[in-house]
Amino acid sequence: MTKDLGSSSVFVRIAWAGLAAGGLAALASCSHAHEPVGDRSGPPPGTTARATAESAPPSSAVSSASRASSASSLGPPAPAPRCDAPHEPFFFVSPAHPVAGRPLRVLAVTDDAVDATLSFARASTPASAAGGDQEPVVQTRDRRGGPPYAWLADVDAAAAGKWRLQLTKSDACGGGSLGAHDVTVYTWAAPVPDAPRAVLWRTRQLWSPALENLYSAWIGHLFDAPADAQPSWDTLADVLRDRDRNWLFDYLGAKEDEEGVAIKPDCADLPYFLRAYFAFKLGLPFGFSHCSRGENGAPPHCADFASNEDPFPPVDDKPQAVPSWADPDRPPGGPWDDSMKRFGEFLRTTLADAAQSGAGRTPAADEDGDYYPLRLSADTLRPGAIFADPYGHVLVVAGRLAQTPSSAGVLFAVDGQPDGTVGRKRFWRGNFLFAIDPALGSAGFKRFRPVVRDPKTAKLREAPNALIRDLSVTDQYEGGVEGFYDKVEDVLSPSPL
């Protein structure tokens, strides 16, 4: 895993130093009015620059990258590229332990819409602000998404040794490195660690703005498709097993995504399953609460927070029975010593049972919920955010197209259905229902509350409101229903057509 290079995104910022419904709500259904469903297989995402390290000339990689830009719906945004780049890029390599002769994927992610090229070349000196000294074997100028913006390239088979990832400004912007990162390609495969006995997975690092950016970019690429497409998949597992879409495919080096684990979330499960999968792969904290749906005129409420380190806390002050797959005293050598099988069973049972749509409708000022309400802006309506409607449906923001002189901006979101299908939809009132009713709770656009480590107890907990910069308990609600829709449209299309 690469280091956090300190993106200053306003998306999520933890200020804690040292923390490295009534009857309608009760209906709570994932079935929802939507646009006609297209091809269930989903069109292929935008292709990436690809080369075999030390076998393909740089020119072929550039050609492949240039073709990619026309295929991706979330390609270069409409606004002219900026040459200023105040944020350092975050670099990422998949798998976590690259092995000679095997494919790897390289990325750079930043908040800046800068015109730049990502290159992967042999390195003879440590990464620095100075340029690389060898010709790249793969490079791409294809800037995707925004914000955050990502450059992505595939290497079919890298040779063992030291390599350098570098993001460089275009000649039109004066050239010069925006940042670099050294990558080691090994001659040997890393041993697969044993599944932990007591925790779901070990926490190896904490969430940061750069990792939140990476999460957003991952979601955007996972569900990418041409703008006029309406892709649908039979299950989320079909998406995650698509190597081109999922850059975390077999990230742990254990062929974990080839085990055929069933992953079939409904709408309320989908954001939790995506967040848990990303956290499981990267060793990040993950948490979830046990929430009510709201009843007798009272909105939903959440309590009894659980995490990857403490997945079975008491609920309603009563101890939970620990299932056999999570029993720390289980006999060794059984199927639950396989980390991916345990993770899949956690999704299918514990998390699916706990996750429900009431979690997305807790009151805006409530600090006990898994989500917090966003201040609406072009920076916050990014992949990974969720939309919870007042009546029990939940969608995950999957991408956004910027406004052009001739067309309005577009917001894409994906949702799950009770039969496990996942489809992509555009923002419009028929898909994104909104109401303001205290008995139903607070609907609208929200984001996962960051899970942090309490400096006093060393336990994982959810961050309070005061530590989240892009939170607003009033922004989506103060203008009423019409004001909400007007504000979203203003974010998507800030200029008159």
Predicted stretch roles:
Residues 31-33:
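Bacterial signal peptide processing site
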Residues 74-99, 111:
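Short, compositionally biased P/S/T/A/G/V-rich stretches that sit at domain boundaries
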Residues 102-106:
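Structural beta-strand segments of beta-rich domains
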